[in-house]
From Swiss-Prot:
<keyword id="KW-0472">Membrane</keyword>
<feature type="transmembrane region" description="Helical">
    <location>
        <begin position="6"/>
        <end position="26"/>
    </location>
</feature>
<comment type="subunit">
    <text>PSII is composed of 1 copy each of membrane proteins PsbA, PsbB, PsbC, PsbD, PsbE, PsbF, PsbH, PsbI, PsbJ, PsbK, PsbL, PsbM, PsbT, PsbX, PsbY, PsbZ, Psb30/Ycf12, peripheral proteins PsbO, CyanoQ (PsbQ), PsbU, PsbV and a large number of cofactors. It forms dimeric complexes.</text>
</comment>
<keyword id="KW-0604">Photosystem II</keyword>
<protein>
    <recommendedName>
        <fullName>Photosystem II reaction center protein I</fullName>
    </recommendedName>
</protein>
<keyword id="KW-1133">Transmembrane helix</keyword>
<dbReference type="GO" id="GO:0009539">
    <property type="term" value="C:photosystem II reaction center"/>
</dbReference>
<dbReference type="Pfam" id="PF02532">
    <property type="entry name" value="PsbI"/>
</dbReference>
<dbReference type="GO" id="GO:0015979">
    <property type="term" value="P:photosynthesis"/>
</dbReference>
<dbReference type="GO" id="GO:0031676">
    <property type="term" value="C:plasma membrane-derived thylakoid membrane"/>
</dbReference>
<keyword id="KW-0602">Photosynthesis</keyword>
<dbReference type="InterPro" id="IPR003686">
    <property type="entry name" value="PSII_PsbI"/>
</dbReference>
<keyword id="KW-0812">Transmembrane</keyword>
<keyword id="KW-0674">Reaction center</keyword>
<comment type="similarity">
    <text>Belongs to the PsbI family.</text>
</comment>
<comment type="function">
    <text>One of the components of the core complex of photosystem II (PSII), required for its stability and/or assembly. PSII is a light-driven water:plastoquinone oxidoreductase that uses light energy to abstract electrons from H(2)O, generating O(2) and a proton gradient subsequently used for ATP formation. It consists of a core antenna complex that captures photons, and an electron transfer chain that converts photonic excitation into a charge separation.</text>
</comment>
<keyword id="KW-0793">Thylakoid</keyword>
């Protein structure tokens, strides 16, 4: 039961990290100032 709970937590955290990373990486791309992304 503990392994199942740990697996669920890992999967949830993995998807949350992917969502946050995708949001942060696509956020500067929408803004006109892309110098910050290149720097």
């Amino acid at each position: 039961m503990l392994a199942l709970k740990v697996t669920v937590y890992v999967v949830v955290l993995f998807f949350v990290a992917l969502f946050v990373f995708g949001f942060l990486s696509s956020d500067p791309a929408r803004t006109p100032s892309r110098k910050d992304l290149e720097d």
